[in-house]
């Protein structure tokens, strides 16, 4: 078992008020047969705490483990969201690499052609050489500007994706995320819960 998951399970166990001794003292023969049957979906739903009432990380931890055990299909939606995010970030990274390589190729080509343009045998006027230098500088500025615009666009798209993910967490009734202000920084408990979800989804 992953060490992070093991640590979280240990934390979950320590935060529970039910002990193994209490469980052993229960007289199983006193449980009616009708209650020993497999619980229905309705009963399972009601056995999980109301997410809106959860305000602390230990309570959220218990809720997530119960949700993962009883209704894993809900966390499956988060797994798809995580996969989509990773795929989008990978595409952005590849696109930026292609953009940088394109600019570097143009720069190398200019460096190759520059000795030819400065060859005295070609007898080019000095104003032509100055124009070439100015063109090179302008091209470099254009390339840097294009790269900066790409980075700014990625930042905007990342912020939009972040807000959409917060909305999905709220829609799935994930504790601590039911009423989140997009402009506020996440609390430490929210960050810990996100890390827990990442560990579970990556397991």
From Swiss-Prot:
Q: Which domain of life is it from?
A: Eukaryota
**Pfam families, sorted:** DUF2458 (PF10454)
On whether Nucleus is a keyword of this UniProt record, the answer is: yes
The protein's UniProt keywords, in alphabetical order, are:
Cytoplasm, Nucleus
Q: Name one GO cellular component term.
A: cytosol
Major localization listed first in the record, in broad terms: cytoplasm
Bias (Polar residues): 124-138
Q: Where is this region: Disordered?
A: 117-138
According to its UniProt record, where is this protein located? Answer: Cytoplasm; Nucleus
Q: What is this protein called?
A: Uncharacterized protein C557.02c
Q: What is the lineage of its organism?
A: Eukaryota, Fungi, Dikarya, Ascomycota, Taphrinomycotina
């Amino acid at each position: 078992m992953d060490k992070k998951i093991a640590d979280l399970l240990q934390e979950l166990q320590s935060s529970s008020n039910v002990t193994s001794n209490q469980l052993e003292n229960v007289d199983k023969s006193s449980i009616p047969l009708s209650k020993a049957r497999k619980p229905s979906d309705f009963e399972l739903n009601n056995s999980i705490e109301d997410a809106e009432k959860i305000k602390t990380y230990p309570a959220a931890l218990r809720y997530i483990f119960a949700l993962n055990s009883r209704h894993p299909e809900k966390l499956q939606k988060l797994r798809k969201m995580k996969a989509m995010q990773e795929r989008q970030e990978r595409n952005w990274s590849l696109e930026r690499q292609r953009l940088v390589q394109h600019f570097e190729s143009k720069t190398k080509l200019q460096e190759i052609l520059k000795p030819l343009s400065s060859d005295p045998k070609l007898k080019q006027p000095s104003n032509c050489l100055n124009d070439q230098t100015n063109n090179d500088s302008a091209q470099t500025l254009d390339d840097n500007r294009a790269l900066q615009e790409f980075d700014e666009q990625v930042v905007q798209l990342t912020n939009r994706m972040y807000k959409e993910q917060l909305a999905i967490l709220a829609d799935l009734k994930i504790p601590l995320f039911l009423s989140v202000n997009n402009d506020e920084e996440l609390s430490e408990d929210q960050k810990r819960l996100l890390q827990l979800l990442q560990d579970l989804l990556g397991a």
